[in-house]
Amino acid sequence: MAGVAQNGHQEMDFCVKVDPLNWEMAADSLKGSHLDEVKKMVAEFRKPVVKLGGETLTVAQVAAIAAKDNAKTVKVELSEGARAGVKASSDWVMDSMSKGTDSYGVTTGFGATSHRRTKNGGALQKELIRFLNAGVFGNGTESCHTLPQSGTRAAMLVRINTLLQGYSGIRFEILEAITKLLNHNVTPCLPLRGTITASGDLVPLSYIAGLLTGRPNSKAIGPNGETLNAEEAFRVAGVNSGFFELQPKEGLALVNGTAVGSGLASMVLFDANILAVFSEVLSAIFAEVMNGKPEFTDHLTHKLKHHPGQIEAAAIMEHILDGSSYVKAPQKLHETDPLQKPKQDRYALRTSPQWLGPQIEVIRSATKMIEREINSVNDNPLIDVSRNKALHGGNFQGTPIGVSMDNARLALASIGKLMFAQFSELVNDYYNNGLPSNLTAGRNPSLDYGFKGSEIAMASYCSELQFLANPVTNHVQSAEQHNQDVNSLGLISARKTAEAVDILKLMSSTYLVALCQAIDLRHLEENLRNAVKNTVSQVAKRTLTMGANGELHPSRFCEKDLLRVVDREYVFRYADDACSANYPLMQKLRQVLVDHALENGENEKNANSSIFQKILAFEGELKAVLPKEVESARISLENGNPAIANRIKECRSYPLYRFVREELGAELLTGEKVRSPGEECDKVFTAMCNGQIIDSLLECLKEWNGAPLPIC
């Protein structure tokens, strides 16, 4: 543990031999389930205070401070215990200057021109900020060339955390000023582009320094969205000390770090972890509405593969499906009629744990890498007060950001690819086990094309997401007179990953709306089948039981086979015109009677015992009553009085359905209504972006004990 030396600087146990390479610490951080980690992240995100001490900052805390809706409610507090260490390093710089010590960035020029020398340390820091203000904003502070306020707030928080550790030679008062800006929701304007994240995020961070020093080109956004100059920003934030005259090393301490890249990466990974869990639950719902076979989640299968991400994904899906009546009903049908559907479900369903598992592991690993980065000291030189020296190294190299963001983005693209494959099966009546083409729910499929437009949109989203999966880090250019000849491109990669997260949210919201549509269609299917079955049974009893003279007729034995036809036939293949001779229901019902007539043999020659003679009577009465009964069943469901309740209420996935239907008011879509699919998808997308969907997602898994079902 860290202690405080007599000189006030934090004293770390760097020489302790236990875990000298930090591998054990990295491994320990991955203990426990990913879901538990996500729950912890959500809890941290919702805490009202983020306490900074330099070593315990999390991606969830960064995301909380960054979030626009949290700006007025979540506050930052600095550890008073860090003050002494920060002061010690600042005093050391001033003392070394007074002794004439030659230090990089304090008495020398920068980068490839570090051979230049000066004794005017304050002026050197001022010039550093001026020449790094090289960003381009375009038309105003809200232009597309300005870093979003959330990204800037994240960067400010991370930079404070780094500087609190006391290795950077900066005054504590400057950190307090940045904290006041955060707590009063005053956000400096930073350029979106212009950094290679080595030597740190020099250009964007220089604009925070520019605001602190009162540069005339500095701008900020106030708590109500107003544009502020530096003087106005200080007044609104309650920074009464006036603009800072930077001491030697303070400008370098502010700009020479990876905070913009790692701050944005933290925001991205908070969302990515939630999206990973979301994809597991959506895959389970997909299995429900597709009447999938649940054995693909059996623990033995996944235990034999050994990968923890896969094992957890399967266990989560198993938990959802174990409590699902959607799975139990088709299971009975598959047992009695194994040819009703293929022996195995297609890959998008059956191998979803194997597909999602590695992506979860990648996202989780990236999260840990970024959490190490936001708790690191990542500038140069580092002030080692205990050994009375400045260390010249390269912690500003943001490679952990670039690499983790490239990897996370590839994982997000893979999740999106699975969603698109599942969505494509869901809307295709050749694959979806009886759901209507395009998930149309209207009475006339010729005037209702359901989710056809949404499938096209999903293809577009998926294509863009796959393009974004291409790595950023292999596009490095040698910079700054070949001094920065390798650089991480961390912020660029984080920006592209933020785009990927946004697109995956578009896909997830569209997919969830489609799944809710499928759930309601299964409900409609069950009620329509029930109405058809009851009607066929009643008509059969009336027309097939008795002969013309009141005797029992041999056609009475047809009823069981007629009802079997209704059970087996996909409802939506005939629902728009149940008695059409062109649709399979009437054809197969007639075939049952024909088959029985053929078996009736010589009895067919007798008009009183002929089954053929009964066909016209049966079909005639069925045509007279069945359309009315089908329409009546549909109307009853639309009015909220269905004969059979919606199975989803008995399922563990119900909280997500309830959220979409009741909390957001997104309704069943039909061609008969004015509302479009995009309007409903927009509701879910907005809710996802605002974090409103998280509680419903976690409620689906509240009973999961963190382990798969036992192998019996």
From Swiss-Prot:
One GO-annotated biological process of the protein: cinnamic acid biosynthetic process
Sequence positions bearing 2,3-didehydroalanine (Ser): 199
Positions annotated as active site in the UniProt record: 104 (proton donor/acceptor)
Induction summary: Strongly induced during the hypersensitive reaction to TMV or to a fungal elicitor.
Location in or out of the cell: Cytoplasm
Pathway: Phenylpropanoid metabolism; trans-cinnamate biosynthesis; trans-cinnamate from L-phenylalanine: step 1/1
InterPro entries per record: Aromatic_Lyase, Fumarase/histidase_N, L-Aspartase-like, Phe/His_NH3-lyase_AS, Phe_NH3-lyase, Phe_NH3-lyase_shielding_dom_sf
Cross-link 5-imidazolinone (Ala-Gly), where in sequence: 198-200
Enzyme Commission designation: 4.3.1.24
Keyword Metal-binding: no
Function according to Swiss-Prot or TrEMBL: This is a key enzyme of plant metabolism catalyzing the first reaction in the biosynthesis from L-phenylalanine of a wide variety of natural products based on the phenylpropane skeleton.
Cited PANTHER family: HISTIDINE AMMONIA-LYASE (PTHR10362)
NCBIfam families: phe_am_lyase (TIGR01226)
UniProt protein name: Phenylalanine ammonia-lyase
Organism, as annotated: Nicotiana tabacum
Taxonomic lineage of the native organism: Eukaryota, Viridiplantae, Streptophyta, Embryophyta, Tracheophyta
